[in-house]
Amino acid sequence: MSGTSSHESFYDSLSDMQEESKNTDFFPGLSAFLSQEEINKSLDLARRAIADSETEDFDSEKEISQIFSTSPASLCEHPSHKETKLGEHASRRPQDNRSTPVQPLAEKQTKSISSPVSKRKPAMSPLLTRPSYIRSLRKAEKRGAKTPSTNVKPKTPHQRKGGPQSQLCDKAANLIEELTSIFKAAKPRNRSPNGESSSPDSGYLSPKNQPSALLSASASQSPMEDQGEMEREVKSPGARHCYQDNQDLAVPHNRKSHPQPHSALHFPAAPRFIQKLRSQEVAEGSRVYLECRVTGNPTPRVRWFCEGKELHNTPDIQIHCEGGDLHTLIIAEAFEDDTGRYTCLATNPSGSDTTSAEVFIEGASSTDSDSESLAFKSRAGAMPQAQKKTTSVSLTIGSSSPKTGVTTAVIQPLSVPVQQVHSPTSYLCRPDGTTTAYFPPVFTKELQNTAVAEGQVVVLECRVRGAPPLQVQWFRQGSEIQDSPDFRILQKKPRSTAEPEEICTLVIAETFPEDAGIFTCSARNDYGSATSTAQLVVTSANTENCSYESMGESNNDHFQHFPPPPPILETSSLELASKKPSEIQQVNNPELGLSRAALQMQFNAAERETNGVHPSRGVNGLINGKANSNKSLPTPAVLLSPTKEPPPLLAKPKLDPLKLQQLQNQIRLEQEAGARQPPPAPRSAPPSPPFPPPPAFPELAACTPPASPEPMSALASRSAPAMQSSGSFNYARPKQFIAAQNLGPASGHGTPASSPSSSSLPSPMSPTPRQFGRAPVPPFAQPFGAEPEAPWGSSSPSPPPPPPPVFSPTAAFPVPDVFPLPPPPPPLPSPGQASHCSSPATRFGHSQTPAAFLSALLPSQPPPAAVNALGLPKGVTPAGFPKKASRTARIASDEEIQGTKDAVIQDLERKLRFKEDLLNNGQPRLTYEERMARRLLGADSATVFNIQEPEEETANQEYKVSSCEQRLISEIEYRLERSPVDESGDEVQYGDVPVENGMAPFFEMKLKHYKIFEGMPVTFTCRVAGNPKPKIYWFKDGKQISPKSDHYTIQRDLDGTCSLHTTASTLDDDGNYTIMAANPQGRISCTGRLMVQAVNQRGRSPRSPSGHPHVRRPRSRSRDSGDENEPIQERFFRPHFLQAPGDLTVQEGKLCRMDCKVSGLPTPDLSWQLDGKPVRPDSAHKMLVRENGVHSLIIEPVTSRDAGIYTCIATNRAGQNSFSLELVVAAKEAHKPPVFIEKLQNTGVADGYPVRLECRVLGVPPPQIFWKKENESLTHSTDRVSMHQDNHGYICLLIQGATKEDAGWYTVSAKNEAGIVSCTARLDVYTQWHQQSQSTKPKKVRPSASRYAALSDQGLDIKAAFQPEANPSHLTLNTALVESEDL
């Protein structure tokens, strides 16, 4: 049989082989061991041998131990040479006095498996590993061969001749031996028994193969440590080398195996990595531990590289070699600069081998503030567990009987997924080496099917690898999509040629039903092409409520029937009632009450489809990180083991309509019965802090009820570990793409539209959601909108690193955190609520019925629309802070304003004011014209006599930012959180002692966006908390604001309220204001937009200071508005320039920019004219429109033909308006490149005498001068060597007391905007005695040829260097002719 066949799949895990065995052969190479007939005979013989196993004696055990300590060399031998080599090997070791009876090696292998070397449970059938079974085979073989077991002499091959039974015994034992070695080698590898795998090279660590032992003090050991220890158990050098050869057989089959001679002891072998590096993603400040094993003869030399740069032993980077073959690289404290591709290179005279892995250091910034406090903390000496973003939901359902164990299954959302999501780590599984630059495109992350509601933002993203240049195109239904404001095509280039992966994104700013279809991303290069396809489903606004019915038919076939839900709900309420208030907060999500209860009934049918995991055993003895009832809890880091990309999930079921109606009726009856009693106070939803760090053991133990094993709902509610753990690999998507966007299915348990990081983490400007009342309306009739009571409420900041797409098939359920959150502060009672205020804990008493519990969880009134017309989340009033009823405006009489345009404006304003409450109740949205009027005129631009209080004035100044502005805000925050800050004047200082119960900063109240007029005061206010007390930094447009600023007043109160105030705003104050809070636990930032509008130039009265009653007169008709009798144009407003530039003077050749801002309804069109002639856009003239409505005419470069009178004309249906300015183009300054009037001369000087090197150069503008000696720049003057320059172009280098070291070539360079020129000369320094022997004989110089002309053009003036008068006389003492061309 083949020597390598048993090892070609050395790295395959047991779970893979178990799965393959159902459909194909158990092991691909077994056919090389035995024929099918021989296998059958061997197994029959094995059964008979087992029957004799009871008669085994203790002597055989001694015999096995002797054999094991002697020579395991034949583990790696070809079976046909096994006996011969055993004899030869034993004869080569006469000094070894131990007995070496020749036995087949299954006993030795068995000994190694059952020895204390491996503490793991064998991953194979106990039948195959029972020592009695293998010993029985040996005894049967001995009886067949008639060989005494006490013979000490080694046997020769002819002595081994036995009957056919002996040969069959030998083959059966060899088969078991090979299987045992395969299983033994496969177990420590980083695959888990349930089939989840990592790549053999450069793959991410799989989360399920991290047993709790990894986090103990010995956690830094390699997962292959069993092999290493087994190798160290082998005492003799021959045995060790043989084991290495056995490992060599395990390399991937694309490497050639060297033929093995009879004696493999000293045969040279090229290095091979038998254990490769693994990619990691760790938090900043954690320890990075890379290890690999390499074999080779002679022992290879191992070197480490990071991004091609060799690493050496330093205090920060420790490189070790243990046991000759285990090589480790440890970074004691990792920082973001350590991110990169690490390569280990092993070389010896026979060849070389490499292994590489990616190490990504997640910065300790507040971008991931919601989840960063879940950073994995391992004990000293432990390898930090890789952090990964995950969107999977794993529900572990415990059975009522402790004997039946648990079943783990995953659930898929109701969508239209057809393709599986490829793991982002798949691109790392490629051959090492430098030959990876030529390959066709490969999609490492496919597009995902998406379903959205009309008007939402859609992000389609995929990742592709391939040899550059990659051409990426997008298609919809076969038609190519061009980049436009509606369909933005983004392509992020790879960060290095070593990892040529591009991120391709298609962003649809606002979706309409006609946008639905099949979207295809096509990537091609010179070596091939690839495509990725996904389907986009757009539900129109009027069918939004039924979308849940139409989308959920894909994966329901396994879950059709459900028992009646009331008993389930009773279980849920009882289980919840026993929890602490902080635990209740985790699970009071509007959908969890029903979905958990319904889901726990599905798994009776799904138990037969477990993923290769024994139903009563779980995974590694754990039930998704929660131990069985008779086991101790694992460490928190085990609970938090994350996943990188989950497999596709099974479908979430729908309840039977009859059951649904039953529930509705029951809830309605109980609500009507409870209406006679005082209703429980609705609990407010204060801004929730980010998740605290993982609690210690006692806290986890306290979270577990002390009763019998938890009910299924308890497991379901807390089984998903760290669903929002941070970690972006090389890409950060702007925050506005994860604004709250919900599909709104018809019932509370329908499919939500996005993951927790998208639906419950809206963009930063969203206010806290309004608390909904509990009216007796069937809660199942309202869509799944905002989630007002989710533990990570809407005010939690949304992280800029890449969240899942808008609708991710793998992120279906908002998952409660594993750890309890701190209890929220009590709500501020309003006058109408004061009598009913109660603590959150009183809402969930034992006396509540299941239906009352559900009705308390689910909002009864229709929630506000999740998004506005722009696709952004709508703001609603925070709970506990009811909107103050505004006073009735005193409206001017109709007679006063009839016949003017003010009637239209006033009508619009009245609609806008009184429509706000309707908007919050989900009523029809504003029309396009109303929205434009609101945006252009401002919320406070009513044309009536309006007396307002200051707080109402401030409230009316708030406005919503556009998606483009939000994108800019996200980029600013992302950069700021990763940039150093100025610590001057900071009153908060941190010590080195870590704070107990530390908590990263979080915002209890965020900054708002304001739109004001020039000269008005403005105050940005927010409230921040954290432990220890965070430091606060303010920025404007990314630049830090000094606390000592005269223009801004920065304050911070004891309760954490921070404010930035300016008394009189100017146009320069327009911008984005960011506050960043930082403490040792992390950073977080929040941004408010301030739009400052210029005061109306057409006679608007100046704004009165805040605090005084503000009276505005009705807007008068503008003087240039035309005839008084022109008809009213309803809903149309004539253009009006809010900003216009004045006359400009620009130098010829420079850039000229003219900015203006115009308002009007409908939006005006702008055109530009120069001296009455239209300005056409071309390469030098560009017309741009920015997001904030600023129009720009950009001219680059400006020429004399561009001078003149420019007129900007704004036109819409209501009329037109214009302004003019004059552009004066100044003459271009004359530039002349530098030129040497007098050049440097070769000079000689006696030792100790001063010398001057001088020249003269002219140019316009005056050039800069640079001196060089040989190749060293002379940057500054010293006492001995000084550089001088005057206004007439004279340049001098003065050396006081020249020495031999001053001799050499000197170059002077002159540079200005027009060019650069250089000149070179030589300085020679000779000793004193040369001066007496100088010759006065004139010297002749042969004219130089033209071959030096090229050097002269480059600044080397060779002719000047060899002029007769320039040569010192000591060079011509012995020659009358200087060969200038030979110098």
Curated annotation (Swiss-Prot):
Domain Ig-like C2-type span(s) in chain numbering: 271-360, 440-539, 1001-1085, 1135-1226, 1233-1324
GO molecular function: actin binding; cell-cell adhesion mediator activity; muscle alpha-actinin binding
Residue ranges, annotated region (Interaction with LASP1): 646-676
UniProt-annotated stretches for the region Disordered: 1-22, 52-169, 183-238, 609-653, 673-728, 740-846, 1096-1125
Record region (Interaction with VASP): 562-566, 819-823
A Pfam family per the record: I-set
Location of the region described as Interaction with ACTN in the Swiss-Prot/TrEMBL record: 833-890
Tissues showing expression: Detected in both muscle and non-muscle tissues. High expression in prostate, ovary, colon, and kidney. Not detected in spleen, skeletal muscle, lung and peripheral blood lymphocytes (at protein level). Protein is overexpressed in FA6, HPAF, IMIM-PC2, SUIT-2 and PancTu-II sporadic pancreatic cancer cell lines.
UniProt induction comment: Isoform 3 is expressed de novo. Isoform 4 is up-regulated by TGFB1 during myofibroblast differentiation.
SUPFAM superfamilies registered for this protein in UniProt: Immunoglobulin
Region (Interaction with SORBS2, SPIN90 and SRC): 676-696
Gene Ontology biological process terms, A to Z: actin cytoskeleton organization; axon guidance; cell migration; cytoskeleton organization; dendrite self-avoidance; epithelial cell morphogenesis; homophilic cell adhesion via plasma membrane adhesion molecules; keratinocyte development
The protein's assembly and partners: Interacts with EPS8. Interacts with LASP1. Interacts with VASP. Interacts with ACTN. Interacts with SORBS2. Interacts with PFN1. Interacts with LPP. Interacts with SPIN90. Interacts with SRC. Interacts with EZR. Interacts with RAI14.
Matches recorded under PANTHER family: CAVP-TARGET PROTEIN-LIKE (PTHR47633:SF16), IMMUNOGLOBULIN (PTHR47633)
Name recorded for this polypeptide: Palladin
Organism: Homo sapiens
Gene: PALLD
